[in-house]
Amino acid sequence: MTLRLNDLKPADGARTQRTRVGRGIGSGLGKTAGRGHKGSFARKGGGKIKAGFEGGQTPMQRRLPKIGFRSKMARDTAEVLSYQLDKLDAGDVDFVALRAANLVPSRAKKAKIVLKGELSKKFVLKGVAATAGAKAAIEAAGGSVEE
């Protein structure tokens, strides 16, 4: 048998008629039309529940306590570890020099030196905050800190 365009038809069962609901009890889907009795799912627009809604029970996001917050100061301040300063040339160190050396990300608005490791070079910090331990280490290496 040759295949012709006018003989083409979908496979058996590939295209079924849509089920008509609510058209008498003889159909098996009359009266409640497969939606059950009452409740939100039986209604028009039913089943569309807001995220977090738990049926009137106090929702999880209200049952649990609020905890913590993200400090804007911490977000805008970059930490620079003291041993990373050795990547720079000895001398004056300010925020611009730290950014040029890629020690401070572009989103940061200020920097703070934190003590970790040893310092071998003499630095003069200008306009950069430092912890008490970092100040002591810089001064012990012969440098100074100017706020």
UniProtKB/Swiss-Prot annotation:
Keywords: Ribonucleoprotein, Ribosomal protein, RNA-binding, rRNA-binding. Binds to the 23S rRNA. NCBIfam families: rplO_bact. It comes from the Bacteria. Part of the 50S ribosomal subunit. GO terms for cellular component: cytosolic large ribosomal subunit. This is Large ribosomal subunit protein uL15. Residues 34-47 have a biased composition (Basic residues). The keyword Ribonucleoprotein applies. Belongs to the universal ribosomal protein uL15 family. Residues 1-61 are annotated as: Disordered. It comes from Xanthomonas oryzae pv. oryzae (strain MAFF 311018). Residues 23-33 have a biased composition (Gly residues). One of its GO terms (biological process) is translation. InterPro entries: Ribosomal_uL15, Ribosomal_uL15/eL18, Ribosomal_uL15/eL18_sf, Ribosomal_uL15_bac-type, Ribosomal_uL15_CS. Signal peptide: none annotated. GO terms for molecular function: rRNA binding; structural constituent of ribosome. Residues 1-12 have a biased composition (Basic and acidic residues). The keyword Ribosomal protein applies. Pfam families: Ribosomal_L27A (PF00828).
